[in-house]
Amino acid sequence: MKKKYLLASLLAILAAGIYLYYFHARIYQEISKANLKSPDKNQTFLIGADMDFQKNIVYAALGDSLTAGVGVLNYEESFPYLIAGKMAQDGKKVTLKDHSIPGAKVGDLKDKLVSAAIADNPDIITILAGVNDVHGKVSLAEFKNSYGAILKRLTEETDAKIYLVSIPFIGAPSLMMPPYNLYIDWQTKKFNSVIKALAETYKAQYIDLYSPTAAQFKTNGAHYSPDLFHPSAEGYAIWAKIIYG
């Protein structure tokens, strides 16, 4: 009897593992099929240049494909550009420096982007990163160490005001099927708790993007681009409004 119970348990675990592996692979197959590209980026944009503003704000945006604007055709529809536009409307000339690598994990930002961002001598920095760590099964400890190393350098080597944007839930239900969607949601919350704690440690401002958008982004709709993972122009506009406040 015990042997039968043990065998049944092992088979159930094996079946669950195969199921999760299949849907994990399927997600990336579907995203790849959409073949979305990053919009053309000059990496530097000047917003409000035609206006007579005395103050020029340098805004450095660090992140992955979500900062690069994957899902839209023009970088002007990305959330960093939309935020820079809102700053200009408030009477500031803004130099936007895009520092993003689609597919990047936080460790990649640490190794490849931070030095360039520091060289910009920015006044404002946003970091939206971690979704690839969540999906890439990076450990919480590694994530915390890499993110902390980024913040240590930014706080020591710049005078910028730093905004840490929480990892949003992304993945339409037709792409992220249960129970994988539940697992990703659970992991996202855990990683966000690390970001929030780091914000307190390094005196950065934490912006909760997860809570006000999770319900909507757990549904299909026009807020998603064709790959059902990256936001559309409508989705990025929602994010920009929340991030800018």
PLM regions: where:
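N-terminal secretory targeting modules
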Residues: 1-60, 244
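Serine-esterase "nucleophile elbow" of acetyl-processing enzymes
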Residues: 32-100, 115-121
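Active-site-proximal beta-strand/loop segments in catalytic clefts of secreted hydrolases
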Residues: 62-64, 99-102, 128-131, 165-168, ...
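Surface-exposed cleft-lining segments at the edges of enzyme active sites
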Residues: 69-70, 99-106, 131-141, 178-184
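Oxyanion-hole/transition-state-stabilizing segment in secreted/luminal serine hydrolases
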Residues: 106-144
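Generic structural signal for well-ordered alpha-helices
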Residues: 147-151, 192
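Catalytic His-Asp segment of secreted/periplasmic serine-dependent ester chemistry enzymes
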Residues: 170-245
